[in-house]
Amino acid sequence: MRLSNLIASASLLSAATLAAPANHEHKDKRAVVTTTVQKQTTIIVNGAASTPVAALEENAVVNSAPAAATSTTSSAASVATAAASSSENNSQVSAAASPASSSAATSTQSSSSSQASSSSSSGEDVSSFASGVRGITYTPYESSGACKSASEVASDLAQLTDFPVIRLYGTDCNQVENVFKAKASNQKVFLGIYYVDQIQDGVNTIKSAVESYGSWDDVTTVSIGNELVNGNQATPSQVGQYIDSGRSALKAAGYTGPVVSVDTFIAVINNPELCDYSDYMAVNAHAYFDKNTVAQDSGKWLLEQIQRVWTACDGKKNVVITESGWPSKGETYGVAVPSKENQKDAVSAITSSCGADTFLFTAFNDYWKADGAYGVEKYWGILSNE
């Protein structure tokens, strides 16, 4: 989800270690997801008969008003996609011909919830969510937006040991160090440098944590920024400059793995220049905001977006979904209905279709966020009780 105001004022930057970034939500994403369905094109599915799927209008604008979408018709479960590969991180960024299928979550969460903290134990078998996915996203903020303590982060991470990779968005709140100290020995981390005007500071923070509590082998990827183009915070060429700066600083610090800038799938489709900069395409995509997709079709929908991004990059870059999930609470949007049961079904569909290439969004409910349009922004926590 987009963290807006990425290039913050000095006063906000100085407060970064004390509070969560403001307006971390899907605000700009809602207005564009349905513009993906505008006309028909043809793709080849595993060498079989061609299948018509909806594609983007060539002149679509990222922040245009919502367009009425038509239902997609592709049988996407067999779409051939490639997973990201890295010689530095073979175990986590693996090359694959298509997303792997796996078992998915089958039970519902039933415990009562409390908004005193953004994390809560559901009593669910966490392994049912973690099986077959690349990882899960995590943010270290209290309900008030204040930073969680090291012990609180450790308590959260104790519930996430079955997830292969933990994705972080920034370096504030001492989160890199706290997660390194708390994660399981076999877990990896996908790190982020959120403030693009503080890249060197972010690299220094990461380097310190890595050298003190782990090694660069624990890091699968570093992202420079999150949804910069989708949020109108940078042009594609500026994103390229940020990635180059980050890659150089990280290399000097001893890291030689993948460097990316995460954006939305629609931003990449509308701005294929972005394909030139990241080592692989790291994109966020949420079927709920399509409004024409039910939770049970989330996996099929997500595969279609992977195919679109891969095609936009002329098949030259592998695609990893760095956020996808379903809200458990909020307003019905078209045929998309938030509920805990639908969240479970969406996670199951995503895991079965393309889990090996997907980070689930997110570990716990984010009560520190504003409700946002449709009232869903707080309620994406897969392990939370509501």
UniProtKB/Swiss-Prot annotation:
Alphabetized SUPFAM superfamilies for the sequence: (Trans)glycosidases
Main location: secreted
Keywords: Cell wall, Cell wall biogenesis/degradation, Cleavage on pair of basic residues, Glycoprotein, Glycosidase, Hydrolase, Secreted, Signal
Residues annotated as catalytic: 323 (nucleophile)
Cross-referenced InterPro entries: Beta-glucan_modifiers, Glyco_hydro_17, Glycoside_hydrolase_SF
Cell wall biogenesis/degradation as UniProt keyword: yes
Signal peptide extent: 1-19
UniProt region (Disordered), positions on chain: 88-127
Post-translational events: N-glycosylated.
Subcellular location: Secreted, Cell wall
Glycan attachment points: 89
Single GO term (MF): mRNA binding
Pfam families in alphabetical order: Glyco_hydro_17
E.C. number: 3.2.1.-
One Gene Ontology cellular component annotation held by this UniProt entry: vacuole
Function: Glucanases possibly play a role in cell expansion during growth, in cell-cell fusion during mating, and in spore release during sporulation.
Family note: Belongs to the glycosyl hydrolase 17 family.
Further remark: Present with 38000 wall-bound molecules/cell in log phase YPD medium.
Designated name of the protein: Probable family 17 glucosidase SCW4
Source species of the chain: Saccharomyces cerevisiae (strain ATCC 204508 / S288c)
Gene encoding the protein: SCW4
